[in-house]
């Protein structure tokens, strides 16, 4: 009966295709981060729905409603803390997942890679919109500074900024729009994730050696589902430790102050996972140039499949690309540090050097 349902029922067929999925035998724990991203997405959607039930998208009540959730809603402090900190876990997983893809040349699977980069861009946008919603000092000023960057677009810039703001400054209309989009985008991410998985199942998974592994495969369940379960347990231990012991560890102290348009924070900065892109933005003296560099810091991933194909499909077999990859990781971490510092010497000069190095490394990796 069970086998009949798995073969003939549409939902059963989908489940069966996952269970019977042929995976390369030699994939490591780094291939588990895709399933961890799915877990983080489900966690974010569920906690976000509960938070949306109590949040008020109004500039006079948003900050108080966030405090009300933490103080008076049953387990509201837990739901809010899980939502805020699992966003950090989400980005740890997504950066590791992307890094693994670059290292093992997963960009050779073009359709899967393109959808994945689009997912990264929309996830970054969604996280930024969510950062604005508590309507603290850093939320307000981050919204003002980042949206104002669009004014660098020739001819249409100012009109686009006013359209996004819903007026001539960040106001109630802006907050309402950001709230609506922040609620909508996770469902768009879910749809794109399904596309990502469909393309992945069509092309088959990559492996550490970068070789054709069609003759050396194992069923996903129970072997790799058990391996993924270990990653899930470790992720929940990490998330639980932060949520229960240091819930405000990754939250900017300025955001515990209600938004005040008349007082500018000493140093405006986004969440830690945006700091590398923010450092690249600040390193270019010209406004339009900075915006283009910011966009290209992520959009350059779209061009990886079009660059020269490496002799070997995996950086583990290519000493030059292996060194270049770890230089890229180091560069990314240094940019994250620079983004958290004020725009003054020597941080400004280091940021400019690291920005040039960041884009140069991609060029080095693209050459045979």
Curated annotation (Swiss-Prot):
Record's keyword annotation contains Metal-binding: yes
Cofactor(s) the protein requires to work: heme b
Keywords: Electron transport, Heme, Iron, Membrane, Metal-binding, Mitochondrion, Mitochondrion inner membrane, Respiratory chain, Transmembrane, Transmembrane helix, Transport, Ubiquinone
GO cellular component: mitochondrial inner membrane; respiratory chain complex III
Superkingdom field: Eukaryota
Co-factor binding comment: Binds 2 heme b groups non-covalently.
Stretches that traverse the bilayer: 33-53, 77-99, 112-132, 178-198, 224-244, 288-308, 323-343, 345-365
Binding positions (a ubiquinone): 201
InterPro entries: Cyt_b/b6_C, Cyt_b/b6_C_sf, Cyt_b/b6_N, Cytb/b6-like_sf, Cytochrome_b, Cytochrome_b_C_euk/bac, Cytochrome_b_N_euk/bac, Di-haem_cyt_TM
Pfam families assigned to the protein according to its UniProt record, in alphabetical order: Cytochrom_B_C, Cytochrome_B
Record's bilayer topology term: Multi-pass membrane protein
Keyword Magnesium attached: no
Localization of this protein: Mitochondrion inner membrane
Binding-site residues, heme b b566: 97, 196
Residues the entry annotates as binding heme b b562: 83, 182
GO function term, MF aspect, one: metal ion binding
GO biological process: mitochondrial electron transport, ubiquinol to cytochrome c
Family that this chain belongs to: Belongs to the cytochrome b family.
Subunit structure and binding partners: The main subunits of complex b-c1 are: cytochrome b, cytochrome c1 and the Rieske protein.
Purpose of the protein: Component of the ubiquinol-cytochrome c reductase complex (complex III or cytochrome b-c1 complex) that is part of the mitochondrial respiratory chain. The b-c1 complex mediates electron transfer from ubiquinol to cytochrome c. Contributes to the generation of a proton gradient across the mitochondrial membrane that is then used for ATP synthesis.
Full protein name: Cytochrome b
Lineage: Eukaryota, Metazoa, Spiralia, Lophotrochozoa, Bryozoa
